């Protein structure tokens, strides 16, 4: 029945297909009558749709992407293999190297700034200030706005509102200030989400431990650095890696706010016009705007390797901290 739907064939075979499937399940239960086998069959039935979707939407495209990165694929067909030519061209492309460098800088800065801002907001939202629910909702709200919409809204703010405070010079007109603007927008968008995770971690700190520290004469600063922060070390690790992976994948705000434009006078002797173009946007422009799908796919594979390495490190560190706790 699923094959009929995918192929677009008529629905006349849907009923017989479902009946055959049901008969197959009953036959399997008859051939394997034990409860253990029945549970295995039922588990497979429920897991199969998710597993099938994962294979079709993730595994197969990934394998095809690796394959196409070694060819001269133009999005429709390929004429032959080119080996590592796309990877060599990638690392010989000044605009790509620039995008890789500013993406790493963007990730490092945001990994620190977002977590600091989010942690401070979390401390505020776990204090005894009135209206905490309002503050939590207000800080989290920007995360619910789509990145494209957010980028165009802030583009209007920078070009039409804040321009009056900067001598009629938009912050988006220069590469350095435009990157600062992207960082500000990213912090404004993502800090509220990270804040909620920190709030969860802070609220799980045992109250009797905090009360004991107060009895022992510990002030707020000592309690923060000696008790709260060590006890939410696992939460800090999670938030750090969430911010890291999210910053690496920055695309929509970058596209809507600056579209990667910005001049760089000299980068290894080259004049660049993609001063604010980060890695994800560079991959998109290579494949879509320049119609160089094979080179774009090679860049995407490198991008995947970076994110996979970050994820593996995160899992290892998280597991290590859980064992220590």
What do these predicted ranges mean?
Residues 2-10, 39-325:
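A structural signal for multi-pass alpha-helical bundles of membrane permease subunits
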Residues 1-38:
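Transmembrane alpha-helices
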């Amino acid at each position: 029945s699923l094959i009929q739907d995918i192929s677009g064939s008529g629905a006349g075979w849907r009923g017989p297909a479902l009946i055959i499937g049901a008969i197959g399940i009953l036959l399997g239960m008859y051939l394997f009558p034990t409860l253990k086998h029945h549970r295995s069959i039922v588990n497979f039935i429920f897991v199969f749709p998710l597993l099938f979707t994962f294979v079709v939407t993730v595994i197969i495209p990934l394998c095809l992407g690796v394959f196409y990165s070694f060819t001269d694929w133009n999005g429709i067909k390929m004429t032959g293999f080119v080996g590592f030519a796309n990877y060599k061209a990638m690392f010989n492309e000044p605009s790509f190297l620039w995008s890789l460098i500013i993406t790493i800088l963007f990730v490092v800065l945001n990994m620190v700034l977002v977590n600091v801002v989010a942690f401070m907001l979390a401390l505020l939202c776990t204090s005894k200030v009135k209206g905490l629910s309002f503050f939590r909702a207000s800080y989290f709200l920007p995360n619910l706005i789509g990145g494209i919409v957010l980028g165009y809204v802030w583009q209007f703010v920078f070009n039409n509102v804040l321009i009056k405070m900067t001598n009629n010079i938009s912050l988006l007109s220069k590469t350095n200030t435009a990157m600062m603007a992207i960082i500000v927008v990213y912090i404004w968008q993502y800090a509220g989400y990270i804040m909620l995770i920190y709030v969860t971690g802070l609220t799980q700190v045992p109250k009797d431990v905090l009360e004991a520290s107060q009895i022992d004469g510990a002030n707020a600063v000592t309690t923060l650095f000696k008790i709260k922060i060590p006890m939410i070390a696992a939460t800090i690790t999670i938030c750090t890696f969430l911010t890291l992976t999210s910053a690496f994948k920055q695309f929509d705000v970058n596209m809507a706010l600056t579209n990667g434009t910005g001049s760089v006078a000299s980068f290894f002797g080259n004049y660049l016009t993609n001063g604010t173009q980060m890695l994800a946007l560079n991959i998109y422009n290579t494949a879509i705007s320049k119609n160089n799908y094979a080179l774009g796919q090679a860049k995407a594979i490198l991008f995947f390797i970076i994110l996979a390495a970050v994820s593996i490190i995160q899992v290892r560190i998280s597991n290590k901290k859980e064992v220590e706790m």
